[in-house]
Amino acid sequence: MAEADPRLIELLSYYRDAELHGASLLMRLIKLMDDPDAQVKLSLHLHDETRHAWLWTKRINDLGAKPMKISDGYQTRVGLRTVPRTLLDILALTVVVEERSFSRYQEHLTKHDNDEQTLAVLKEVTNDEKWHMAWIRLKLLEIARQQGDESKAEAAIEKYRKIDAEVYAALKAKEIAVFGESVA
């Protein structure tokens, strides 16, 4: 087997790191939410996030490499700009993080020269992200309505989208430096 491209291993390690941090965010939500339906959905969502981290770990191992420790990943960079303190903020951040994961994986599907196994992982995690975005958004809107102002949900999402745009721009610049404009 040919040695894996270290740039690809680094990129897949970033994906793995994002999924692990996503699981951590869901653990916070599990502790904050008493709603039985939310507890069921959060448990499945947490299962998905840790499974995604495992799928990236396995893909890296199958390529003959080891996952890299990522110290400047997406959620670490978001955390340097803000720490959500309310349930609405954590839900809004989760919506934005899931949207970013979905769009990032979609982009990877079209821009990188993917082998069959990497394509399979990308398709599997992308499919799960659709449900993650939908149910968290609905729960966020429901809680905002219960608190008397649904517009709080959209305002929180917009707040985190602005932070996401800054963070993603920096990560994208790094990816362009590594892979070049045509792939990144």
PLM regions: where:
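Non-heme di-metal
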Residues: 1-184
